[in-house]
């Protein structure tokens, strides 16, 4: 399947994501240092906008969108996207809910082993 939508990536992401999007026919603009002012001028030209935690998608930005279908967060939370404003414009908001699952599991296991060692030395 191939798509023709334009994608704006507003924050630094792994090159693999950019490659996958391009290989599927999406037109990708990778602007990891885009300023809020520049984003306000450009957001209306894109069907998909991808952010991490640096960029905040406000109600004012969402109101400027004319083509946007998806706001995507590469990460767990959605606190930097005004989800109510997106819903009001029928823009789908998605995130990587399970993105940190392995890292959290590794941390928990590591801390458990650390505390087990401490208990054994008592």
Task: Identify the meaning behind each predicted range.
Residues 9, 29, 35, 48-119:
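Phosphate/diphosphate ligand-binding glycine-rich loop within oxidoreductases
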